[in-house]
Amino acid sequence: YMVIQGEPGAVIRLGDYLIDQGL
């Protein structure tokens, strides 16, 4: 999992990551 700062959709991918972690 990588976040490219300033890339459109980064927040959405972050949300998906947190869901995968069960947070």
Swiss-Prot record:
It is found in: Cytoplasm, Cytoskeleton. GO terms for molecular function: actin binding. Its main location: cytoplasm. GO terms for cellular component: cytoplasm; cytoskeleton. Keywords: Actin-binding, Allergen, Cytoplasm, Cytoskeleton. Occurs in many kinds of cells as a complex with monomeric actin in a 1:1 ratio. Binds to actin and affects the structure of the cytoskeleton. At high concentrations, profilin prevents the polymerization of actin, whereas it enhances it at low concentrations. By binding to PIP2, it inhibits the formation of IP3 and DG. On the 2D-gel the determined pI of this protein is: 4.5, its MW is: 14 kDa. Belongs to the profilin family. This is Profilin.
